[in-house]
Amino acid sequence: MMPRLILASTSAYRRELLGRLHLDFDTARPEVDEHALPGETPQALATRLAGEKARAVAVRFPEAWVIGSDQVADLDGQALGKPGTLEQARAQLTRMSGRMVRFQTAVSLIGPDGFAAQALDLTDVQVRPLQPQEIERYLAAEPALECAGSFKCEGLGITLFDAIRSNDPTALVGLPLIAVARLLRQAGFSLP
């Protein structure tokens, strides 16, 4: 019998990505405060939140394997959170215009037997120089208020970039499947 697997996320994008591995899984909302701690780096924030999300769900489902993931946009060492409002999204996109932004995407796997492992994927995005009217058109068409960096790379947001550099093309969407598959194999899951 396959062990129960739970994705600690309600993100449709993460659910779609994990579905690519052809594993049966459920989803559960992790109740976690996503604010950065004083002095916390973007990498430490992403790693901590991925672990906290997995642990928050594992407490509710102690018999299950739980995957938690978090992504933080890193501009010059400063974490850019989910914008939440159009004003914040506009400000983030303006700050990122013509700049390289590093996306720190962490994943954590926790098992019922005490297994715990994490991985981190780094994706560098070169944002092209953006005119104010381009930002306005983008936000009118696709307000990505719940996305790190204020864009959806799997949608119209891809038009905002000059280049993406990553070892895992799924990481920028929010769940680095190469790392997830590696962690699941380490835990004994059968994947090709």
UniProtKB/Swiss-Prot annotation:
The active site is at 70 (proton acceptor). This is 7-methyl-GTP pyrophosphatase. Nucleoside triphosphate pyrophosphatase that hydrolyzes 7-methyl-GTP (m(7)GTP). May have a dual role in cell division arrest and in preventing the incorporation of modified nucleotides into cellular nucleic acids. It catalyses: N(7)-methyl-GTP + H2O = N(7)-methyl-GMP + diphosphate + H(+). It comes from the Bacteria. Keywords: Cytoplasm, Hydrolase, Nucleotide metabolism. It holds the Pfam family Maf. Coiled coil: none annotated. InterPro entries: ITPase-like_fam (IPR029001), Maf-like (IPR003697).
